[in-house]
């Protein structure tokens, strides 16, 4: 059974579909954090037009966040999954095997990230919201001038009715 996670944000809602069979540990971490409310009220701290939107750090600095496994956990990189276009859900990291809670969604093809970041899902609906986020004004550190925030994240089993 596929797992979907819906994010209600200050700019609208979007849903991601998790690749449980391709990145089981990453998907379990992400879904568990979402279910626990870890991502609620967390800002998108880094937005780069035509590249990606990044969030998942409760400190809002881009340096924080932890996983359900402790501080950091290993990559689950697969050669058959690539950053081929907009809407790819991938883990942010600071080098090999440094995954925590931060993630990004691509706004365009980003092939230079292949083999460096764990891809664990894709945007299933609400890509227009993500594209609008990619257009917000930012400062010289790629931080939005007006806060863009996750209000609530919730796990939805695909195929189930709410």
UniProtKB/Swiss-Prot annotation:
One of its GO terms (cellular component) is catalytic step 2 spliceosome. It catalyses: [protein]-peptidylproline (omega=180) = [protein]-peptidylproline (omega=0). Coiled coil: none annotated. PROSITE patterns: CSA_PPIASE_1 (PS00170), CSA_PPIASE_2 (PS50072). The keyword Lipid metabolism does not apply. Keywords: Isomerase, Rotamase. Gene3D superfamilies: Cyclophilin-like. PPIases accelerate the folding of proteins. It catalyzes the cis-trans isomerization of proline imidic peptide bonds in oligopeptides. PANTHER family: PEPTIDYL-PROLYL CIS-TRANS ISOMERASE-RELATED, PEPTIDYLPROLYL ISOMERASE DOMAIN AND WD REPEAT-CONTAINING PROTEIN 1. This is Peptidyl-prolyl cis-trans isomerase-like 1. It comes from Emericella nidulans (strain FGSC A4 / ATCC 38163 / CBS 112.46 / NRRL 194 / M139).
